[in-house]
Amino acid sequence: MSRLIVGLIAVAVVIGAGAGSGAGAEPPTASQSAATKPPIHKMLIPYPQKRKREMAAYSTRHYGQYKWRLNDPKLIVIHYAEAGSISSIFNTFRTDQPDVEFHELPNVCSHYAVSASGGVNKFVPPTIRCRHTVGLNWTAIGIEHVGFSDQDILNRPAQLNGSLQFVQWLRCRFGIPVSQVIGHNESLSSPFYKELDPRFQGQTHGDWNHADMQTYRSDLTKLGDC
């Protein structure tokens, strides 16, 4: 009888040690975090055949490919939208009109956007090309963030965590290494950069500079391998 009691106490101690919470709790393993698909809210912009033809024509001018499909993406480009809400980003991408910067069709877009609270919104399937980064639209998935600077996102824990968890799942889905998760400002140094139009060669944006992306990639690496 006494041996049974001692055995039950030992089992209870082991279970109690494994069920701790708070500061003593173990974080999820890398494999668990990498495999978790976060909730994704669909807010699909109109992308009819006309816009697809325009995207194929754009790809011909800039990449020498008459294609609108995004096959086997090789990298993920991180942006901030200079916008204060998801609806503002959606409305910028929704209408198919010449973009304000280069006056080309189709209009610009990114595939996803992360809200200030960390929620993920899907604008375009990652099997369709979007105009978000000159020289890389032929092979890159674009992710916008609500905010007006890199630091806006890096200093909002909920948004940063939501972004990291989503990008971890997305890169694992497509077999994209952490080194190929880049900021828009890093586009010109990408080995995948390709631009045939001389007017666009050397063009990039200031969002997500190298130093801030090093911080982002370091945090992403902490989530582990796929």
What are these regions (language model features)?
Residues S2-I9, G20-T133:
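N-terminal catalytic cores of peptidoglycan-degrading enzymes
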Residues V134-H145:
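Short coil-to-beta-strand
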Residues A12-G18:
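Hydrophobic h-region of N-terminal signal peptides that target proteins for export
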Residues P28-K52, L70, S149-C226:
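Basic/polar, cationic surfaces and motifs that engage anionic cell-wall
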